[in-house]
Amino acid sequence: MADHPDDRRYTKDHEWARREGDKLRVGITAYAVEQLGDVTLVDLPQLHTKLRAGAHFGDIESVKAVSELFAPVSGEVLETNSELERNPERVNESPYEQGWMLLLKPDSPSEFDALLDASAYAEFLASLSH
């Protein structure tokens, strides 16, 4: 299983968020990608959409399934990764870098702080295999 970068926080729905100044970059984890298989489509929200922590914000389709994407924190969508429209496989190739999905302006920094750190996420994944 892939390592989980410790410069970001994680959710139990397998999304990650990385702080970039006063913004957060969001994507899905390597574990999620592993479960999905080859990604064929990523459906993301419009710019300036307001998201609520834990709420559905888009969908990701793969050869195996269609899965919902959930916001790790509340905030406003400032940017989406338009590269994923043309090349959804970027999510498979690089879930933590080129496969990012959203850039958010978070409503509250405390929501980010409440997410799982890399070691807590790794422990959560270990609990899934038992």
Model-predicted segments: where are they?
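Acidic, low-complexity mobile loops and tails
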Residues: 1-56, 93-130
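Short, conserved beta-turn/loop elements at beta-strand boundaries and strand-helix junctions
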Residues: 19-22, 80-86
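Short, charged/polar surface micro-motifs in flexible loops or helix N-caps
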Residues: 33-34, 74-77, 82-84
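Residue-level recognition of conserved beta-strand edge/terminus positions
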Residues: 54, 60-61, 80
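Short, Lys/Arg- and Gly-enriched loop/turn segments at beta-strand edges
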Residues: 61-70, 87-89
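Short, conserved catalytic or interaction motifs in soluble domains
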Residues: 62, 82, 106
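ATP/adenylate-binding site constellation spanning eukaryotic-like Ser/Thr protein kinases
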Residues: 71-74, 118
